[in-house]
A protein has these predicted regions:
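Structured alpha/beta reader/binder surfaces that contact nucleic acids or chromatin modification marks
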Residues: 1-8, 184
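Charged, terminal alpha-helix-loop-beta segments
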Residues: 12-249
C-alpha cells in the first residue's frame, strides 16, 4: 500500500465510530474486497447453496459451513415516512432524519417525479449510500449516489437541511468535495456533482439571500476545475406531498 486512498476507508471509519449494524461500502471497495477474498481462496468458486459462509481461522480462508442460513422473523411491514415528515414540518419540529430516509428510500424509484428530475436528470443509480463517513472527525455525507448518464459516471454528495439555506452550508459541501477528490476519485474516476437541498426560501429579495447566492458563486469559481457547479434544490409541501425544485441562482 503506497497511498492513503488505497485503504478501505468505509471499514476503517466503522471501527473508529464503534457502531454495529450495516455499513455501506462503495463499489470499488466491494470489488477490491471480493478480489482479496478470491485470491485468498486460490480463485476457487465456493458453491454454498443452502449453506452458510463461515471463516476458518486456522486456514485463514472462507468456507461453507454445514448449516442453513437463518431466516429473518422480525418486522416486515413497510414504514410510510411521509406522514411523519409532514407532521413534523407543519409543527416546526426537526425532521432532517426523516427527509434523509425519504430521499434514500425513494430516489430513482419513480415515486416522486420532482425528486428524480432534480437530482438524477435521467441518470441511472449504480450505488446509493447515506450517512457516508468522510473523515476521521466523524463527518458524514447525508446522501451520496453514484450515477451514470451517457456512459459518464458522477458521484453526487448531497447536503440536506430541514431549514432554509445559509452561507455555512457551502463550507460543509467544500469539505465533502475535498474528501471525495482525495480518497474516492483515485479509485473510481467520476465527475463530482455537489447538491444542496433545503427548505424553500419564500422571499428571495432579502440581503441574506443575496449573500447566499454570492457564496454559491464563490464556491463555483474556486472549484471550477474540480467539480460541477453546485446544484441548489428547495423542497416544499404541496397537496400532502414533497415537491422538489431546482433553483436557478
Amino acid at each position: 500500500m503506497t497511498s492513503p486512498n488505497q485503504m478501505l476507508w468505509s471499514l476503517i471509519y466503522r471501527k473508529l465510530k464503534g457502531n454495529r449494524g450495516n455499513t455501506m461500502i462503495t463499489v470499488y471497495e466491494a470489488e477490491r474486497l471480493t478480489q482479496i477474498i478470491r485470491n485468498k481462496n486460490n480463485r476457487t468458486e465456493l458453491n454454498c447453496e443452502n449453506k452458510m459462509l463461515s471463516f476458518d481461522s486456522n486456514a485463514q480462508k472462507i468456507i461453507c459451513a454445514d448449516r442453513r442460513p437463518n431466516s429473518y422473523v422480525g418486522r416486515k411491514e413497510e414504514i410510510n415516512l411521509l406522514p411523519r415528515l409532514i407532521a413534523k414540518y407543519q409543527a416546526g419540529n426537526s425532521f432532517e432524519a426523516h427527509l434523509q430516509a425519504y430521499i434514500t428510500k425513494n430516489l430513482g424509484e419513480g415515486k416522486n417525479r420532482s425528486l428524480d428530475e432534480t437530482i438524477l436528470d435521467g441518470a441511472e443509480i449504480e450505488w446509493l449510500g447515506n450517512e457516508v463517513s468522510c473523515g476521521v472527525g466523524m463527518q458524514r455525507i447525508d446522501v451520496m449516489p453514484s450515477i451514470m448518464k451517457n456512459s459518464q459516471r458522477a458521484v453526487v454528495p448531497i447536503e440536506l437541511k430541514a431549514v432554509e439555506a445559509d452561507e455555512r452550508n457551502v463550507i460543509q459541501i467544500q469539505r465533502y468535495v475535498d474528501w471525495i477528490e482525495q480518497y474516492y476519485i483515485p479509485n473510481c474516476q467520476s465527475d463530482i456533482q455537489p447538491v444542496l437541498i433545503t427548505k424553500k426560501i419564500e422571499d428571495k429579495t432579502t440581503n441574506n439571500y443575496r449573500k447566499l447566492v454570492n457564496s454559491f458563486n464563490r464556491f463555483n469559481q474556486t472549484t471550477n476545475s474540480r467539480c460541477n457547479p453546485l446544484v441548489f434544490i428547495e423542497f416544499s409541501i404541496i397537496r400532502n406531498d414533497l415537491f422538489f425544485e431546482k433553483v436557478t441562482y
